[in-house]
Amino acid sequence: MGKNVVVLGTQWGDEGKGKIVDLLTEQAAAVVRYQGGHNAGHTLVIDGEKTVLHLIPSGILREGVQCLIGNGVVLAPDALLREITKLEEKGVPVRERLRISPSCPLILSYHVALDQAREKARGEAKIGTTGRGIGPAYEDKVARRGLRVGDLFHRERFAAKLGELLDYHNFVLQHYYKEPAIDFQKTLDEAMEYAELLKPMMADVAATLHDLRKHGKDIMFEGAQGSLLDIDHGTYPYVTSSNTTAGGTATGSGFGPLYLDYVLGITKAYTTRVGSGPFPTELFDDVGAYLAKRGHEFGATTGRARRCGWFDAVILRRAIEINSISGLCLTKLDVLDGLDVVRLCVGYKNADGDVLEAPTDADSYIGLQPVYEEMPGWSESTVGAKTLEELPANARAYIKRVEELVGAPIDIISTGPDRNETIILRHPFA
């Protein structure tokens, strides 16, 4: 029997999922994206060469691994085709191994225009979206008016739906946001060009997955963003527009939850966040700058500097509960090298002095202060360590304390960006 493993982020994204998915796909027959869009940025470093993927599953760099984009992903055809071209220039036969669900909602030019117009109108109160049309595309899906990938192959039907959509969205763009209208004919012509290129890659992803399952193949489900950005469970409204938690695996792929064997939660040894929203352990001092510099904390999708702070056990405990995490992968441990003291947030204190767990909305974070434990740091390098015994004693103590605070085992430790710089204590596919 094969094993089916979910890999997802437990913080606010950027936890290092891409590297771990790439590492574990050595055993997988297929890798599946099940939510999000090209707002994700998964960075892989193989033999020193960096590749950033936004839509295509990270298993694409492993020869023979099938890559699937499930119905829960909002798909921007132009972004996907650019990504395919870049990989093909490196000799990766993407079109042979990539299959896309015809049920994926499309992201088209009017979604991008709406996304950017809204952020501009919000001014200082902006959410911090990537401006790539993700939210508006999910809105159209939920409103049951959205165009899907499968619609591309029926020109008349597509044109009729597009006309109705542009009547609606152009009214909002022109009369509410005072922005230019999107041209119908240009949008239609571009979409029909995409159709010819995408058609050979269409497949019933759910049926493909169940066929693999029946043949005893190992399957990996690759999450995007992080659990605290989940539309339902995140720091609302500073969240993304999809379910980034483990429940999204089933709805975004057609693969029922009882078939999932292991959920791997990826967490940094510290905490980062891109864009607006609450961040109790955020640092504005030299330590924050140190983490940002050593961790190269700039978004793979937007290039924006990430906010940095101490490890937060409170949000991780919440993520472990809502995802039924089987085990954790601790990434970027090496970024903490050289610090005299490391801190871990163990709770939040309100104005009355009460220690609380993680709130469920952004406003409830106002006025909360982190409660810290301090531990001695380490001066020795952890970069490239392959065994637990190679790590400094204080680094091992830090790892043990994280496990105690969050109530879940750390099964994998990442000690550098390359797939080889990893300590595997328990393999998810074992």
From Swiss-Prot:
Substrate binds at A300, T301, T302, G303, R304, A305, R306. One of its GO terms (biological process) is 'de novo' AMP biosynthetic process. It comes from the Bacteria. Gene3D superfamilies: Adenylosuccinate Synthetase, subunit A, domain 1, Adenylosuccinate Synthetase, subunit A, domain 2, Adenylosuccinate Synthetase, subunit A, domain 3. Mg(2+) binds at D14, G41. Signal peptide: none annotated. Pathway: Purine metabolism; AMP biosynthesis via de novo pathway; AMP from IMP: step 1/2. The keyword GTP-binding applies. CDD domains: AdSS. GO terms for molecular function: adenylosuccinate synthase activity; GTP binding; magnesium ion binding. GTP binds at residues 13-19, 41-43, 306, 332-334, 414-416. Binds 1 Mg(2+) ion per subunit. One of its GO terms (cellular component) is cytoplasm. Its cofactor is Mg(2+). Keywords: Cytoplasm, GTP-binding, Ligase, Magnesium, Metal-binding, Nucleotide-binding, Purine biosynthesis. Belongs to the adenylosuccinate synthetase family. Homodimer. This is Adenylosuccinate synthetase.
